[in-house]
Amino acid sequence: YEPGGTLQIQHDVLKELGYPEINTIYDYEEAIKSYIEANPTTEDGQQRIGLSLMASDWRWLITTGNIASAALGIPDDGQFKVDDETGETTYKFTLPEIKEYFQWLNHMNDIGLLDPESFTQKEDTYKAKISSGRVVGLSDAAWDYSDAEKTLLSEGKAGSTYARLPVTVSEEYK
């Protein structure tokens, strides 16, 4: 079993911040913000990136859509929320509560913590950023960034690999 989590953050961040509880997207944001304020660049002088997504192609569903619903406690039933008792299905992107997650991403962009290339970058660019150790946070499936983590490990940068966190939009979601 390998937990996916909804959002991932570098192990170094957790260590430096004293292993804080990160339960909501707002806790996650605060951890990224605090870490980047204290460590704006990597050891080799590269500017850190708060949160990067791979949303320029079909993976938008993996790094944006699925995560948005998971952060609301909605199981991954494709692009739908299924009521287990009635069988009623709803296209998840029409749910009013999903809006808060996308507003949060917009806010992350506004404050400079969302990689501005998140919705335009190509896969090789995305993985190169992760492999460099610059990307503090991810919103992705482990299978999509595991090769980049292998590069980090081969370079002795285990602290730049990612802890998978069960982050939700707010405490009301499980």
Task: Show the residue positions of the predicted features.
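Extracytoplasmic/secretory soluble proteins
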Residues: 1-174
